[in-house]
């Protein structure tokens, strides 16, 4: 029986056997996976045990309810998978056997999935870039929420997969300068290679002042902040221009005391916006929604306008060692941005 990678409880990664249906429903596909990638920020919150501390989200009251849980264990691990279609349901007309496909799913050698939220890939589409459709969609939502326009100056805090994709999208939007901030040297290097005009090491410096100086003391038109760190949010408020936008998109734990909303924020009156692509309706409803964001990113990937070759690293083999390697890689941001997985048959 095949096995998939799961988080069985907080801080414990292991394997779970699963069984696939013998007969497909009309709208289903049977897929054999070749490559995959993880979603570091969100999954780390649950693997490390702090993702459930706020309780359960109550959809009727639109708030967290203490005492419940957001996700129950075991939690399947893995974010996006690339695979080959082996069988199609009777109602599926947009896929054929041997088509190359991208979809949301867990690390597993095979899967049966619905046809919704799947994307066809060419044989020459790089799998690493394809599996970054998810962080690029999150980044595109943040870029649109920020109101960035051609010629705008932008600061991007935290160069994980989302931040690095935001750098590329800001470049495509014609922003200048694009200033990327992260304490990890290899992430700053990737940002420079993929569109940033300047990078900053935030440790031991006044980042807000540096960003203002880089823009002739005007301040950046928008900030996209994905670290969730109080210090980064404070620097964002210090750096943004009068009336500019600060977009917060991270999923952090509760912050410590000390955020000062009475300094630059009070005088320069920036707009503080929270961004989340999965929270439909979007600010630009009804024209924009999550499905359109994903379709736009898929087109950018297929047109070769996004590049994740230096983002998805390291690439691990789908073997019994993966459970032990998972936590090691997820706990070493200085060595990895977004790790990938290669399955036994990965020729396409």
List the predicted regions and their residue ranges.
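A structural motif shared across PLP-dependent enzymes of the aminotransferase-like
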Residues: 76, 104-116
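Mid-domain Rossmann-like dinucleotide-binding core that forms the NAD(H)/NADP(H) cofactor-binding site
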Residues: 100, 126-204, 209
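Rossmann-fold dehydrogenase core element
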Residues: 245, 259-308
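C-terminal hydrophobic helical "lid"/dimerization subdomain
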Residues: 237, 284-348
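Glycine-rich cofactor phosphate-binding loops and adjacent beta1-alpha1 units
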Residues: 148, 194-273
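N-terminal glycine-rich beta->alpha transition that marks the start or flank
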Residues: 18-81
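A glycine-/small-residue-rich N-terminal strand-loop-strand element
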Residues: 71-104
